[in-house]
């Protein structure tokens, strides 16, 4: 293992001892904020240090086995121990490197999910509704809560655009690689000749800002309009101006919210989505810069990139970034995304490990 990594691990081991001591200090336990911070740090450090101590023990066992190689009576046993120990050491080194990878500070956060119909007219809107159902079912599987913030439906029950807040620990870490272009190939319900059509939708996954204060929203930069909320086909569902449209003048970002009968609640939701979008723009700019430097496809933040194709006649889904094809489209559309999300996370980790090895 690289000396710089060993130095870092030794420092983390010392820090764990220090944190353990502080958690037993009555003065610290009286300060709940400090106690919570230290408890979280202790939980983060413990698995790293445990693996490090296991690595050190394996290194010591290997040294003992090497000493026995000169003993004719023990040579065969020593060689077997060396072989096993070296395999164990390689596994421990890989696990330690993964544990040392930089943590995404947004991983534990709730998210705002946006699905927009692209090319394909009504069929694209129907596919947007299918995608939204897919993510909603995935959220249910993880016992997360889904709250629709804003939805624009067409007459066939599809979504021109739908924005939802998904509340659940680690939601961003599991869904952050879903942003991008999603393409569908199938025979639309409106097609009478049985021809396969290709349509597309765009998905955006944004971490919820901790607080609105985390993103500076200068009131002078905002234009807030109110209007009557309307349902599919333009029918009014509310006779008061409860719907809210917020425009962020410096960026041109526009957020509409009309799902609640309360103008106050709609405004609060719209501002929360706006804060997430502004934060997302800043984050994607950083990601694209980093991705250009390391020629990464995963987590590049490029929303124009076509990331996945759903082919209904063949029952397959293909993620183009990692060349993964699954012939279980029905299960995927029902929210069984674990195989996809796990593979994308593993690929991202591999990219980070390669970067770590090159540093």
UniProtKB/Swiss-Prot annotation:
Recorded hits in PROSITE patterns, A to Z, give: RF_PROK_I
Q: How is it modified after translation?
A: Methylated by PrmC. Methylation increases the termination efficiency of RF1.
- Record Pfam families: PCRF, RF-1
Where does the record say this protein resides?
Cytoplasm
Q: Which residues carry this modification: N5-methylglutamine?
A: 235
What does the UniProt keyword field contain?
Answer: Cytoplasm, Methylation, Protein biosynthesis
Which PANTHER family would you find in this protein's record?
Answer: LD18447P
Per the record, the similarity remark reads: Belongs to the prokaryotic/mitochondrial release factor family.
> What function does this protein fulfil?
Peptide chain release factor 1 directs the termination of translation in response to the peptide chain termination codons UAG and UAA.
Name of the molecule in the record? Peptide chain release factor 1
Organism (species): Laribacter hongkongensis (strain HLHK9)
**Gene encoding the protein:** prfA
């Amino acid at each position: 293992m690289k000396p710089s990594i060993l130095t870092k691990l030794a420092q983390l081991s010392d820090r764990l001892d220090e944190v353990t001591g502080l958690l037993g200090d009555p003065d610290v336990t009286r300060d709940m904020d400090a106690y919570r911070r230290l408890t979280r740090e202790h939980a983060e450090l413990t698995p790293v240090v445990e693996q490090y101590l296991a690595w050190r023990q394996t290194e010591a066992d290997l040294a003992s086995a090497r000493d026995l190689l000169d003993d004719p009576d023990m040579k065969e046993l020593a060689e077997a121990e060396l072989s096993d120990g070296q395999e164990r050491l390689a596994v421990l080194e890989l696990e330690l490197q993964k544990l040392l990878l930089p943590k995404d500070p947004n991983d534990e956060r709730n998210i705002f999910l946006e699905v927009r119909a692209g090319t394909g007219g009504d069929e694209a809107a129907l596919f947007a509704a299918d995608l939204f159902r897919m993510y909603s079912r995935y959220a249910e599987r993880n016992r997360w809560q889904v709250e629709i913030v804003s939805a624009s439906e067409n007459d066939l029950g599809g979504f021109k655009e739908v924005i939802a807040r998904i509340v659940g620990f680690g939601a961003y870490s599991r869904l952050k690689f879903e942003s991008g272009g999603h393409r569908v190939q199938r025979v639309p319900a409106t097609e009478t000749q049985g021809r396969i059509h290709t349509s597309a939708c765009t998905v955006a996954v944004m971490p919820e800002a901790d607080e609105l204060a985390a993103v500076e929203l200068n009131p002078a930069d905002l234009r807030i309009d109110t209007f009557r909320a309307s349902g599919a086909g333009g029918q009014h569902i509310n006779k008061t101006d409860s719907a809210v449209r917020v425009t962020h003048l410096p960026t041109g970002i526009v957020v509409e919210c009309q799902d609640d009968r309360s103008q106050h609640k709609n405004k609060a939701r719209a501002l929360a989505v706006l804060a997430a979008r502004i934060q997302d723009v800043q984050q994607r700019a950083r990601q694209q810069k980093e991705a250009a430097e390391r020629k990464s496809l995963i987590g590049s933040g490029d929303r124009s990139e076509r990331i996945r194709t759903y082919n209904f006649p063949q029952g397959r889904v293909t993620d183009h970034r990692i060349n993964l094809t699954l012939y279980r489209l029905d299960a995927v559309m029902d929210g069984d995304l674990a195989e996809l999300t796990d593979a994308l996370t593993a690929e991202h980790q591999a990219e980070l490990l390669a970067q770590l090895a090159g540093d």
